[in-house]
């Protein structure tokens, strides 16, 4: 799929993160390909995966999951703040010839957030 079509997809994966602590937190939001230990098939490399991300109504992307090293957002979330996300995922059209040969490959994408919270200001 082209980047333009990928970013225009109506179907999105909607989620939010909320800081329920008493201090700001520095976070990394990752989209990882976590393959179950019981899976014995072929795994799709992240170099074929593109994403677009909408954060509180502002759009970012397209981005290659491989090029961003799986970190799709990195920022500060303040106490009691909620950040809303809409994510679109597609296969990179520029790698179309490779993708034609990947019919039996699977991806096991999972969101993971890592955060460090400190009582002092993070501005």
Regions found by a protein language model. Give the residues of each.
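Low-complexity, polar-biased intrinsically disordered regions enriched in Pro/Ser/Thr/Gly
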Residues: 1, 39, 95-99
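Surface-exposed interaction patch
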Residues: 3-58
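C-terminal, structured domain-capping segment
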Residues: 7-25, 73, 78-123
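Signature of Gram-negative chaperone-usher
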Residues: 43-92
